[in-house]
Amino acid sequence: MKRKSVTSRDVAQLAGVSQSAVSRSFSPASSVSEKTRKKVMEAARTLGYRPNTIARSLITRSSRTIAVVTYSLQNPFYASLLEKASRFLQQQGYHLLLFFAPQNGDFDMLVDDLIRSQVEGVLMLAITLNQHQAAEVADFGIPVVIINRTVEYSGISQVGSDNFQGGYWAGRYLASLGRQRIAYLAGIPESTTNRQREEGFKAGLAAEGQTCFAYDEGYYRYDDACDAARRLFSTRTMETLPDALFAANDLMAIAVMETLRDELHLSVPEYVSVIGFDDMAMSAWPSHSLTTLQQPIDQMIIKATELLLTHISNPDALPEQLVLPVTPRIRRSTTEGVLLK
């Protein structure tokens, strides 16, 4: 015999509340007392009631769904951003859909997927995405907020960290250690994030009377950074080896340290001091103990999601560009020196 489906009216009768109170109790962002919510949830568990979120979205014309677009999760920093964004949005009563930016550059296909999915807003975590792609999504009336990079387009809200100041600190700090041959390992050269970190780094060196000794590119990827380390360190004499390196992110910095240690038998920091950028969790592991610039990841996520929800509720809200400070985290990958402000 087919079991009769349980409705919100059944739950309301058992809990002794109105149907609208039942509906509000299943919407985390709705106003309802904790006492009422508890009564509704107990009644729902007793009856085996499950709200029909699809039907609700058709009635309210609200999917309560946010898309997160990223290029890859191989970098643990972006995996951490994704986790924190998901938890925060769930607390606000939203669901999260994950999209990966196509490697073949066919961004139109991604835009079509976002529109078909009827998402209410988009968080872009991909450092490879540019302002034209973000604007393409926004042109369809979908609110967009970019995290961890700034783009030269004022029509979209952006939340990033102070890349220039972080690079500036790295350049001055390495020079303060007495290092004379300081290299830079770039991420994606044309990205604004990389340009800001590189420009800050070179300005910091200049403040100490130095210039960048050597340069290579690791594209923010582990394997490419290993290849770059081999080019930078395996074809030189000891007198012409870089004695310090600033990498544009932690993943590349760790790749350099492991290549130096395991393949080239150059110890860190005795031969080479290394600094990264991000302060992802594994950077603090004893096997790495990487000096780095910590991005305020919790604050970035809170600010970005709050901005996105503001744009969803008020499409006329003006876009904001927020730049948050970074914090040096000095560990064993650099020798002791003077902590510069």
Segments from the language model and where they lie:
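Alpha-helical recognition/docking segments in bacterial nutrient-uptake
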Residues: M1-R3, R61-R172, S176, S234
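N-terminal helix-turn-helix DNA-binding module of bacterial transcription factors
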Residues: M1-S63
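Short beta-strand segments enriched in small/hydrophobic residues
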Residues: L14, Q19-R24, L58-Q74, K84, ...
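Glycine-rich phosphate-binding loop signature in dinucleotide/nucleotide-binding domains
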Residues: L47, S117-Q118, L177-G178, L232-L241, ...
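Hinge/beta->alpha junction and helix N-cap segments in small-molecule ligand-binding domains
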Residues: T70-S80, L98-F107, R149, V159-W169, ...
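Periplasmic-binding protein-like
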Residues: V119-A126, A183-L185, Y215-D216, T237-N249, ...
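Flexible loop/turn connectors
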Residues: S234-K341
